[in-house]
Amino acid sequence: MKLIINADDFGFTRAINYGIIDAHNLGVLTSTTLMVTMPAFEHAVDLSKKTPTLGIGLHLNLTLGKPLTNGATLVNEDGELIKPKFTTPEYPYNEEEVYQEFKAQYHRFTEFMKKKPSHLDSHLFSTDIYPVVTSAAKRLAEEIGIPLRNHDTKGFEHVEFMWEKPLEIPYGEYDNLDYIYDNAASILCYDYVEIMTHPGYLDTFILENSTFSTPRANELESLISPRMRQFLNENNVELISYHDIPKK
């Protein structure tokens, strides 16, 4: 089978960036998605240019930090993007404002990276949770000809998306990637699979702005561990990125 191991949150912080690069250079990570609105975005761009074998997509962000556009329905009274804990799936986002924000993020990606992203996905599953956001993201994906990876739109129809929830693992049962070994049969039965990860080193910004902190360091250790490499070799797993996937 062919496996994409993708890291979300490239550009979140310098510590996260270094962790993602180490997970690729020292381990089995093949792909990442870049957040263009976060403080360490340009640092991530610089690192990526020294790491041409790492596939890089765009991590559409509607839930953290400041937007690139002025959409009134996207922000709180402080001008910050609205965090999911203050919304519901029916939150009244304006679809055109969401589309324009995502389009601006795409253009910032291409301006700095000098290429198109390998694929689109979203921070905190916003393109899965909010129907209006899903519609705006699909519109952008169709316009630029780059598939959106989410649970329903099947932008990459060949790829099964794996993490704890689809495998029906109780939240918090694992704080590393050992669920891969424990659920190998449910993962290895497909031809193409993406495993979502969040590797990284920790810093103050992450500890103050992310509910997912210590497990990032644990996932990094898993990705660079001899055990993971041995597991993939023993099961004849071919590591690929989204550049290697047939498009619809």
Swiss-Prot record:
One GO term of the biological process aspect: polysaccharide catabolic process
Pfam families, A to Z: YdjC (PF04794)
HAMAP family in the cross-refs: COD (MF_01246)
Co-factor(s): Mg(2+)
Protein name: Carbohydrate deacetylase 2
UniProt family annotation: Belongs to the YdjC deacetylase family.
Subunit structure: Homodimer.
Superkingdom assignment: Bacteria
Function in brief: Probably catalyzes the deacetylation of acetylated carbohydrates an important step in the degradation of oligosaccharides.
Binding, Mg(2+): 59, 123
Single GO MF descriptor: hydrolase activity, acting on carbon-nitrogen (but not peptide) bonds, in linear amides
Assigned keywords, A-Z: Carbohydrate metabolism, Hydrolase, Magnesium, Metal-binding
The keyword Nucleus is assigned to this record: no
Enzyme Commission number: 3.5.1.-
